[in-house]
């Protein structure tokens, strides 16, 4: 984030009370909470993410339910959208309250992190996806066994 506005960051491990505290702070400051949780961005990922149900929210909760689980979503996409939300709040004279436990997501917003734009191709992944199609799961497992028997034993 640029130096023209302050932010509040409430971070910590799962079930440490971040959501409750961030809501209290945001309510007192009459602002919004911006989630920095890599799982809460996905629609339908309500179980296991401790996502505050819509009907229980006392302040706006941003960057939640903004991506489909079946679609590609990257930290760069999150960074762009979350920074835009934060700047809207700052421009309105409000202090964004970031809340969550995904350090990379928070760092991508508050630090000067740059990511390549567009889709990043993974030649290694592409190669092994092609091998999986050709050899099937068993054949791929056999290939793993020739390269790393100990890891193959674990699978």
What are these regions (language model features)?
Residues 1-155:
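Phosphate/pyrophosphate-binding catalytic cores of soluble transferases and nucleic-acid-acting enzymes
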């Amino acid at each position: 984030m640029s130096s023209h506005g302050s932010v509040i960051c409430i971070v910590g491990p799962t079930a440490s009370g971040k959501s409750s505290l961030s809501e209290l702070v945001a309510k007192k400051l009459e602002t919004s909470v911006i989630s920095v949780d890599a799982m809460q961005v996905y629609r339908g990922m309500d179980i296991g993410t401790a996502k505050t149900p819509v009907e229980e929210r006392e302040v706006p909760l941003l960057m939640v339910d903004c991506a489909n689980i079946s679609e590609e979503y990257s930290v760069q996409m999150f960074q762009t959208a979350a920074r835009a939300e934060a700047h809207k709040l700052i421009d309105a004279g409000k202090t964004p309250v970031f809340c969550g436990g995904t350090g990379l997501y928070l760092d991508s917003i508050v630090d000067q992190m740059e990511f390549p734009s567009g889709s990043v191709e993974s030649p290694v992944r592409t190669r092994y996806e092609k091998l999986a199609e050709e050899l099937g799961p068993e054949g791929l497992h056999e290939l793993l066994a020739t390269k790393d028997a100990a890891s193959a034993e674990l699978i």
